[in-house]
Amino acid sequence: MAAKFIILLALFALSQASVVRRDAPLANFLQDLEKRAADIQKTFSEQFQAISNSKNVQDVNKAVKESSDVVLKQLSTLSSSLQSALTDANGKAKEALEQTRQNLEKTAEELRRAHPDVEKQANQLRDKLQAAVQSTLQETQKLAKEVAANMEQTNEKLAPKIKEAFEDFVKQAEAVQKKVHDAATKQ
């Protein structure tokens, strides 16, 4: 019962974290992005801890494997978006984008290596999946801070690309959370 309450609370927090002001200026957008990434990271972590005690081990393992496929695909998309944003960036923003892209590729590679033997390594894969999402959110936060700190050097085309890539990743992370949660609470 307590686990279900925690999951409901986490889902509520996630839904509140998903609210974005569309008319916010660039600086506010970057601050909101940082805050949202931190909220999603916390919620994601709480949900993964709550489902680790699930009695539906097979369903959870299957959901984790399928979710890791989705996260890998989204990490590749996010990395590609950052690569295209590099063409519009300059100075420190370009360095931050390149660093973020490299770190995301490293995270994706670690998740790929943990992926094949899901049944044998379900807990390890679950940990890698959680780490991949958290790492991506942390990289996004670092990127937002760097871009905000170098606002005068940042091209106006760059912020919408970062925002779009982040929004796409958040949608996938939320779908992963829901899928794993549904598998864990299946009766």
Swiss-Prot record:
<dbReference type="GO" id="GO:0008289">
    <property type="term" value="F:lipid binding"/>
</dbReference>
<dbReference type="GO" id="GO:0005576">
    <property type="term" value="C:extracellular region"/>
</dbReference>
<keyword id="KW-0732">Signal</keyword>
<comment type="function">
    <text>Assists in the loading of diacylglycerol, generated from triacylglycerol stores in the fat body through the action of adipokinetic hormone, into lipophorin, the hemolymph lipoprotein. It increases the lipid carrying capacity of lipophorin by covering the expanding hydrophobic surface resulting from diacylglycerol uptake. It thus plays a critical role in the transport of lipids during flight in several species of insects.</text>
</comment>
<keyword id="KW-0445">Lipid transport</keyword>
<dbReference type="InterPro" id="IPR010009">
    <property type="entry name" value="ApoLp-III"/>
</dbReference>
<comment type="subunit">
    <text>Equilibrium between a soluble monomer and a bound lipoprotein form. Apolipophorin-3 associates with lipophorin during lipid loading until each particle contains 9 or 14 molecules of apolipophorin-3.</text>
</comment>
<keyword id="KW-0165">Cleavage on pair of basic residues</keyword>
<keyword id="KW-0964">Secreted</keyword>
<keyword id="KW-0813">Transport</keyword>
<feature type="propeptide">
    <location>
        <begin position="18"/>
        <end position="22"/>
    </location>
</feature>
<comment type="similarity">
    <text>Belongs to the insect apolipophorin-3 family.</text>
</comment>
<dbReference type="GO" id="GO:0006869">
    <property type="term" value="P:lipid transport"/>
</dbReference>
<feature type="signal peptide">
    <location>
        <begin position="1"/>
        <end position="17"/>
    </location>
</feature>
<protein>
    <recommendedName>
        <fullName>Apolipophorin-3</fullName>
    </recommendedName>
</protein>
<dbReference type="Pfam" id="PF07464">
    <property type="entry name" value="ApoLp-III"/>
</dbReference>
